[in-house]
Amino acid sequence: MLKPALLYTQEITRKFTEHLYTTDYFYYCGYPCGNNLPKIEEKDDLYQYAIVDKNDDIVGFLTYRINDYSDTVHDFGLFSFDKGNPILGYDLFRKLEELIKKHHRIEWCVVSTNPVKRHYDKFCKRHNGYIHHWHETTKDEYGNYIDSYTYEIINRGRQQNENP
C-alpha cells in the first residue's frame, strides 16, 4: 500500500542509510558510491510514497515528479527495502497504470544491469511505449561503462488496458 512518505520520514532515511554505497543504491541513484539520501519534502510537483505491507512496515520507497505544464510524469525513483516482496511491484505497476491514464506522458530511466529492467521492458511494450537505449552512459562500482535505457509512454487518448 502506498502512503505519504512524510509520515515515515525518519524510518525511510534510516533504511536508506543502511543501503548507501551498495549496488542496490546504485540502481536507485544511477551512479556508484552515491551518498545523497533522498529528501522527503513537500513540494507542489513532488510525490513521495512509503510502500508498506499489511503490518505498516516499510518495504519500499517510490518518488516521482509531475510537470503540470507538459503533463509529464518524470524523475521516478524506486527502492526496495525488502527484496523480493511482491507488494513493491504490485504497488508500482498499479501506480504507473493510474499515471498513464491520467497524464499525457510518463518517462523513467534504468541502468542496463538493474534486474527490474525486464519488467519495465514488458510494461512499456504493453503500453506501446518507446525504449531508448543509451550506450556507455555511466560507470558501475567496478569502473565498467554500462548502458542505460529511458522508457517513454505517451497517452494520445487511446484506451488503456484495464487489467494488465
Predicted regions mapped to residue ranges:
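Conserved catalytic-core motifs of GNAT/GCN5-like acyltransferases
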Residues: 127-146
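Alpha-helical elements of Rossmann-like donor-binding domains used by nucleotide-donor carbohydrate transfer enzymes
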Residues: 14-18, 91-95, 150
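Conserved beta-strand-loop-alpha-helix junction that forms the acyl-donor binding cleft
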Residues: 107-125
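Short hydrophobic/aromatic beta-strand or adjacent loop that forms the aromatic wall/cage
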Residues: 46, 146-150
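Conserved acetyl-CoA-binding loop-helix of GNAT-fold acetyltransferases
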Residues: 85-101, 118
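A short, well-structured alpha-helix characteristic of acyl/acetyltransferase catalytic modules
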Residues: 1-40, 157-164
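Acetyl-CoA-dependent GNAT
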Residues: 26-85
